[in-house]
């Protein structure tokens, strides 16, 4: 815990968010930016919130990378700041292990297509509270549990990044093969236009094992739609409750959790959970979800995807 937290116990009592920002030695840049973009008064009226507050150094680091927040278009800046306001009060003691996916005050139609609000992952790693935002960008909390009238604030050593579409997210996360197949099947625009979506993305090695070379464009599109659950944002915490859902092509999708905590979809292991998207969430899986067989037009032969577990 930072020395500031220990030396200023008065800041644990009730006061406005504006007062907290103006008196904290590392938050003057955020305070100025919120005033510049006419958000400070709005944020002062909110209740039951958690503010993830990038420090002065975090904004300096951004500027050194060529991203000066004070110079970006106002709608984008406001969306970015709203993304740093979480729904509910999340003190550090409530964030354990993998933690939780929490919705923010960034709501549609601006720069998110998640009805409940764009999400952030909170976790605890070796005693440090961590955030994971769009594109998998991580940040570490410095000062924790600074109270104000509307809730609690944690300072962060980085600015969070807005969730992006599945195309850029797949590129950043090394899922280029899935993106390549999306382009080949002509479903990129379709997938990017979805709202409140869950996408199960096989990693590149899994897709390399799957013999999709003989599939027509239509068959490949159907296969990829089998990895998409529309109108349901299924974060990892949902898997423990188990449940059945329908994919975009009508396949049955069953999620669950094994005794050792491993998440599964139709019995296939999830190797990376809760990749935050502009329109929902993605999970990286260890195999391709397929039907028992896929009929080819013309010769009526069948394509089998090697080493894959069939859907039931």
From Swiss-Prot:
Q: Which Pfam families match?
A: Fasciclin
Any idea where the FAS1 domain is? 17-160, 162-289
The domain of life is Eukaryota
**Gene3D superfamilies associated with the record:** FAS1 domain
Secretion signal, residue range per the UniProt entry? 1-16
Q: Detail the disulphide connectivity of this chain as listed in its UniProt entry.
A: none
Gene Ontology CC: extracellular space
Q: Which biological pathway?
A: Secondary metabolite biosynthesis
User: At which residues is glycosylation annotated?
Assistant: 48, 68, 113, 157, 165
Tell me, using the record's free text, what induces this protein: Expression is up-regulated during the late stage of P.nodorum wheat leaf infection and is controlled by the cluster specific transporter elcR.
- Alphabetically list the UniProt keywords: Glycoprotein, Repeat, Signal
Under PANTHER family, the record lists:
FI19380P1 (PTHR10900:SF77), PERIOSTIN-RELATED (PTHR10900)
Q: Which family does it belong to?
A: Belongs to the fasciclin-like AGP family.
**What does this protein's UniProt record list under function?**
Fasciclin-like arabinogalactan protein; part of the gene cluster that mediates the biosynthesis of elsinochrome C, a perelyenequinone phytotoxin structurally similar to cercosporin. The first step of elsinochrome C biosynthesis is performed by the polyketide synthase elcA which catalyzes the formation of nor-toralactone.
Q: What is this protein called?
A: Fasciclin-like arabinogalactan protein elcF
Source organism per UniProt: Phaeosphaeria nodorum (strain SN15 / ATCC MYA-4574 / FGSC 10173)
